């Protein structure tokens, strides 16, 4: 059933009621929930400072809240005192780390709790398996993203990074090279398919992962938005600017011809975006807290009488167990 919120009608809105189409699924995925809960539990039980390497998930609100609870975010392990303070713990982020980072933590005697998303860990295992059998691994991902850096580090001498079909065309490999591909878990489905098609066209014996690498949450959020974007005059995507899956949602809407904006929360909404619209699409990336959706809806009802209609394409029931160090006894 649609929810109707009544507020003052803002100048510039289309006359009459404005419809807000709310994509579902949206907001937190299982890997993000696991990572955040891991940090919270470590903070509850640690006897020393709790360091988190990189942002635990790519969301400014989440990071700020955990920092307020005492988490110390560092970009690299060398920011942690050596020797580490008594009882110190370092948490690896949901995006995963390379074996070299793990080795560095071991060498320094750091107590580690690994919050790597199990679906990212699956990609790492596949990279190791492909490389071990002698394949050159082609990883489809975004340069500089933490997940990409971690995966490339699994088998650095055997792994190549590509982002576009043009990158595939530029590959210069010896005759007879056996290739297998893997993908970052947060990519756009359609763009990734174009790169995979280019790889298969050029390398007919291309190996592939036993199951899809793009995670269920990324897929569901993109398909949910795709199901309604054609009806929207504008789309608001709740997520931080360094969130890969949130940025892919913005790009999906824009490729469909609909103006779309990435916002951290309601304060980022610009009134001119909503001028003369009758239908607003709202979704949230997998690292954006669900409560921000409610805050954005509340902000929108300050502009007009709105009817909120949820468009659901799937029900998510995936849950991941916590790292053994923080499981309830």
Curated annotation (Swiss-Prot):
Q: Does the keyword Iron-sulfur apply?
A: yes
Entry binding sites for (2E)-4-hydroxy-3-methylbut-2-enyl diphosphate? 58, 95, 145, 185, 243-245, 287
Question: Which Gene Ontology cellular-component terms appear in the entry?
Answer: cytosol
Q: Which domain of life is it from?
A: Bacteria
Which keywords belong to this entry? 4Fe-4S, Iron, Iron-sulfur, Isoprene biosynthesis, Metal-binding, Oxidoreductase
- Give the co-factor note: Binds 1 [4Fe-4S] cluster per subunit.
Any Gene Ontology biological process: isopentenyl diphosphate biosynthetic process, methylerythritol 4-phosphate pathway
Q: In which pathway does it act?
A: Isoprenoid biosynthesis; dimethylallyl diphosphate biosynthesis; dimethylallyl diphosphate from (2E)-4-hydroxy-3-methylbutenyl diphosphate: step 1/1; Isoprenoid biosynthesis; isopentenyl diphosphate biosynthesis via DXP pathway; isopentenyl diphosphate from 1-deoxy-D-xylulose 5-phosphate: step 6/6
Known EC number: 1.17.7.4
Q: Which residues constitute the catalytic centre? A: 147 (proton donor)
Q: Name one GO molecular function term.
A: 4 iron, 4 sulfur cluster binding
InterPro entries named among the record's database cross-references: LytB/IspH
Names of the cofactor(s): [4Fe-4S] cluster
Q: Where does dimethylallyl diphosphate bind?
A: 58, 95, 145, 243-245, 287
Spell out the reaction equation it catalyses.
Answer: isopentenyl diphosphate + 2 oxidized [2Fe-2S]-[ferredoxin] + H2O = (2E)-4-hydroxy-3-methylbut-2-enyl diphosphate + 2 reduced [2Fe-2S]-[ferredoxin] + 2 H(+); dimethylallyl diphosphate + 2 oxidized [2Fe-2S]-[ferredoxin] + H2O = (2E)-4-hydroxy-3-methylbut-2-enyl diphosphate + 2 reduced [2Fe-2S]-[ferredoxin] + 2 H(+)
A Pfam match: LYTB
List residues binding isopentenyl diphosphate: 58, 95, 145, 243-245, 287
Q: Specify which residues bind [4Fe-4S] cluster according to the UniProt entry for this protein.
A: 29, 117, 215
- Which family does the record claim for this protein? Belongs to the IspH family.
Q: What does this protein do?
A: Catalyzes the conversion of 1-hydroxy-2-methyl-2-(E)-butenyl 4-diphosphate (HMBPP) into a mixture of isopentenyl diphosphate (IPP) and dimethylallyl diphosphate (DMAPP). Acts in the terminal step of the DOXP/MEP pathway for isoprenoid precursor biosynthesis. Has a reduced activity compared with LytB2. Is unable to functionally complement the loss of lytB2 in M.tuberculosis.
- Would you tell me the protein name for this molecule? 4-hydroxy-3-methylbut-2-enyl diphosphate reductase 1
Q: Which organism is it from?
A: Mycobacterium tuberculosis (strain ATCC 25618 / H37Rv)
What gene is behind this protein? ispH1
């Amino acid at each position: 059933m649609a929810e109707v919120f009544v507020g003052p009608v803002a100048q510039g809105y289309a006359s009459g009621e404005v419809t807000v189409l709310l994509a579902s699924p949206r907001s937190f995925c299982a890997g993000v929930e696991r990572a955040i809960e891991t940090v919270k539990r470590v903070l509850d039980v640690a006897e020393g400072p709790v360091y988190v390497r990189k942002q635990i998930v790519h969301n400014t609100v989440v990071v700020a809240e955990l920092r307020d609870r005492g988490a110390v975010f560092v970009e690299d392990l060398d920011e942690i005192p050596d020797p580490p303070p008594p009882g110190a713990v370092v948490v690896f982020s949901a995006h995963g780390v390379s074996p070299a980072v793990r080795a560095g933590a071991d060498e320094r005697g750091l107590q580690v709790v690994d919050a790597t998303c199990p679906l990212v860990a699956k990609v790492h295992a596949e990279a190791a398996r492909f490389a071990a059998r002698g394949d050159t691994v082609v990883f489809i991902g975004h340069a500089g993203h933490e997940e990409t850096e971690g995966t490339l580090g699994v088998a650095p001498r055997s792994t190549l990074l590509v982002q576009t079909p043009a990158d595939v065309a530029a590959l210069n490999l010896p005759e007879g090279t056996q290739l297998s591909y893997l993908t970052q878990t947060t990519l756009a489905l359609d763009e990734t398919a174009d790169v995979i098609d280019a790889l298969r066209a050029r390398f007919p014996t291309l190996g592939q992962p036993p199951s899809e690498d793009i995670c269920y949450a990324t897929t569901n959020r993109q398909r949910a938005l795709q199901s309604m974007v054609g009806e929207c005059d504008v789309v608001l995507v709740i997520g931080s600017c360094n969130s890969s899956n949130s940025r892919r949602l913005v790009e999906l809407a824009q490729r469909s011809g609909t103006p779309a904006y990435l916002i951290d929360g309601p304060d980022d909404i610009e009134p001119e975006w909503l001028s003369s619209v009758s239908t607003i699409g709202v979704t949230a990336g997998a690292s954006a807290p669900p409560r921000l959706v409610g805050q954005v809806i509340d902000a929108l009802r300050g502009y007009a009488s709105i009817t909120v209609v949820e468009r659901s394409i799937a029900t998510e029931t995936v849950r991941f167990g916590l790292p053994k160090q923080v499981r309830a006894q």
